[in-house]
Amino acid sequence: MSGVILGRYWGGLSQLIYVIIGAAGVPWFADMSGGPEVLLGATGGYLLGFILAALLLGHFVDRHIRARKFTPMLGLMTIANFGLIYIPGLVVLGLWSLKTQGTLPGPWELLVMGLLPFIPGDILKITGAAALTRAITPKEPYGEEIDIQKAEGWRVP
């Protein structure tokens, strides 16, 4: 949601600051953990994915007025979540497993550890966030949109 609310630059920067401050030791990651070992641990890839997802969602909200509607945002958030957050997350989780256990987990084992348990909750959160997008994003174009000519009929009375 940071990319949706803050836009492409500030949204991405907010997530970068979140990761940097957490890596500096502020315990606000999962299980109230912090420090550089978190970035080098099993969840480090997911944290880096947060930055990528904020940049992508912020770009589309800033540059494409139609992306601010529920259905396009639902698709974008699904891509950001399962592509930009989970792919680096699963890669780092696999490398972390290799480092700590000496074996690289197979693809299915990796999905069972780092993706499948979270799908139901993620779908619920993505749906809620996409629904909120329509309410919190500008209803009028503000000049930077590529598809500004499609803004007619956008404003809800």
From Swiss-Prot:
Functional description taken from the UniProt entry: Probable biotin transporter.
Keyword Membrane attributed: yes
Organism annotation: Methanothermobacter thermautotrophicus (strain ATCC 29096 / DSM 1053 / JCM 10044 / NBRC 100330 / Delta H)
Protein name: Probable biotin transporter BioY
Gene encoding the protein: bioY
Locations listed in the record: Cell membrane
Topological type in the membrane: Multi-pass membrane protein
GO molecular function annotation: biotin transmembrane transporter activity
Transmembrane segments: 10-30, 38-58, 76-96, 104-124
